[in-house]
């Protein structure tokens, strides 16, 4: 039942997700592609977490944050991908009102937490390259845990703002969401109540998180670049650059797509383009992050070889 009487109006009890396409053949193809991507995402990020946990040489702040980035990527992708896979297999995919709120909250929590974790990783690189003598003090276990708590608390607070605003919306119908998940923007368009406050508050909280974390990352890398340019050793410069390239690649991919969706004017791109970019940063990027960090990081590659060697010769 999609609607029920609620006082003087009819309230929506479920939403219909339009998904990515109506073409039945393309749906099957996309189902296979995204199932493979999701399996690689989960296995790759779980492998990263386990490798960091069992390898003593990776028990450093950078890899501590990387393991939680992998956890956030699993949660981020799992918030959307399984539901999207079901959407490919059924003719008319519905999601309950509560289910929509849970999915929205999960996406916001893991996405916001990832912003903070990426900022913490940039700060860690700043301390390692610009203040190496103070690194062990400034990036102690206690400090790392505090930064991680800030990341998850920030994610929770942003989720709370989105969830409260979602529940303040009144949906009278239609109930078709022109997306493959319960994104807040298309839900706002379906509301039959005043959306001035519910539309503003989440934009402010999410925008603040993006701006603050981008500033932290930008300032960190400005100081890192200045420090590297002052180095006289070519080998030292190359080593410093190599420790930052993986993180910079991940930051560029993540914030680049977020900027396209949430910062650029809506009139400059279509809903279908929005969907494609959303797929990239919610489904594809979580798969790419383990590859980015493992292929460009000698310590992770070395730890992986040692673990494989132990398994073979044990």
Swiss-Prot record:
| GO biological process, alphabetically ordered | G protein-coupled receptor signaling pathway; sensory perception of smell
Ranges of the Cytoplasmic topological domain: 50-57, 124-136, 221-240, 296-314
| Ion transport in keyword set | no
Record function comment = Potential odorant receptor.
Acyltransferase as a keyword? no
> Major location, coarse class?
membrane
Q: Please give the family membership noted in the entry.
A: Belongs to the G-protein coupled receptor 1 family.
Which Pfam family name is an example for this entry?
7tm_4
- Compartmental location: Cell membrane
Entry's CDD domains? 7tmA_OR5P-like
| Keywords assigned by UniProt, alphabetized | Cell membrane, Disulfide bond, G-protein coupled receptor, Glycoprotein, Membrane, Olfaction, Receptor, Sensory transduction, Transducer, Transmembrane, Transmembrane helix
Q: What is this protein called?
A: Olfactory receptor 5P6
Membrane-protein topology: Multi-pass membrane protein
Q: List the disulfide bonds.
A: 100-192
Q: Which PANTHER family match?
A: OLFACTORY RECEPTOR
One annotated GO molecular function is:
G protein-coupled receptor activity
Segments on the Extracellular face: 1-28, 79-102, 158-199, 262-274
Q: What is one term from the GO cellular component aspect held by the record?
A: plasma membrane
Q: What are the annotated glycosylation sites?
A: 8
Per the UniProt record, which residue ranges are transmembrane? 29-49, 58-78, 103-123, 137-157, 200-220, 241-261, 275-295
